[in-house]
Amino acid sequence: MTAFEVRDLRVYYGEEEALKGITLDIPEKKITTIIGPSGCGKSTFLRCLNLMIKEIPYARTEGEVIFDGENVLEYEDEADIIAHRRRVGTVFQHPNPFPWMSIYDNVAYGLRLMGMDEDEIEDRVYEALEKAALLDQVEDRLDDPASALSGGQQQRLCIARALAMRPEVLLMDEPTSDLDPIATRKIEETVMELKGEVTIVFVTHLLPQAYRIGDYTAFFLHGELVEANSTEKLFTDPQDERTKEYIEVEFGPS
């Protein structure tokens, strides 16, 4: 089963072609890691999956991003786009909790916008904090401001905020790049515990991280999809010489 079917996806920023005919299936309830050097199109690819690309006035797309049988790139109605983003959550590179809000209110924010009953909101908040491996650290201080948390805790709070919406897909754009090794490992453990429940697309520039957590890996270079395979196969037996060279430079010989 696939969560997304991407077909001949092209993205233009003005005259610059940022993605060049990407065709890729994202398997359902697995972790797909996206690797490649800076500027290769990894983040642009995520923006197409969550339709953030539509917020960029000078961006133009071609091709298809099929989700639940529909090409979501054709959505124009704001209600359809918002509904899609509820099903496809996103965690960004830099932790971005609302610092003026309490820990609890950060997680509850999107649910309140939906007009959900407060009793159900409370259940969802606790559920999301537990799934994000944060509940045991904050349960007795949910009224504290989010700014009181460490960087790693703030990122897990952002994961909880996304999970509270019960998304079918969670997109993660280099979510550990600002974190120390201990916080990074906790995020990785959280992500691996979530697979099986949620489809995860995880962008990373850290090849050891991709190897640790990915079920499948896609290698992007200069806006092209060079190769995609099971993570084990891609790292140990790459089929394209460009993949092999990149892995050997960044990760060591396979």
Swiss-Prot record:
Write out the coiled-coil annotation as residue ranges: none
Full protein name? Phosphate import ATP-binding protein PstB
What the entry lists under SUPFAM superfamilies is as follows: P-loop containing nucleoside triphosphate hydrolases
The UniProt catalytic activity note for this protein reads:
phosphate(out) + ATP + H2O = ADP + 2 phosphate(in) + H(+)
Q: Spell out the subunit comment.
A: The complex is composed of two ATP-binding proteins (PstB), two transmembrane proteins (PstC and PstA) and a solute-binding protein (PstS).
Q: Which PANTHER family match?
A: ABC TRANSPORTER I FAMILY MEMBER 17
Q: Which family does it belong to?
A: Belongs to the ABC transporter superfamily. Phosphate importer (TC 3.A.1.7) family.
Q: Which gene encodes it?
A: pstB
Source organism of this protein record: Methanopyrus kandleri (strain AV19 / DSM 6324 / JCM 9639 / NBRC 100938)
What's this chain's function? Part of the ABC transporter complex PstSACB involved in phosphate import. Responsible for energy coupling to the transport system.
- MF (Gene Ontology): ATP binding; ATP hydrolysis activity; ATPase-coupled phosphate ion transmembrane transporter activity
Q: What is its EC number?
A: 7.3.2.1
Gene3D superfamilies, per the entry = P-loop containing nucleotide triphosphate hydrolases
Q: Name one GO biological process term.
A: phosphate ion transmembrane transport
Record membrane topology: Peripheral membrane protein
Q: Which InterPro entries match?
A: AAA+_ATPase (IPR003593), ABC_transporter-like_ATP-bd (IPR003439), ABC_transporter-like_CS (IPR017871), P-loop_NTPase (IPR027417), PstB-like (IPR005670)
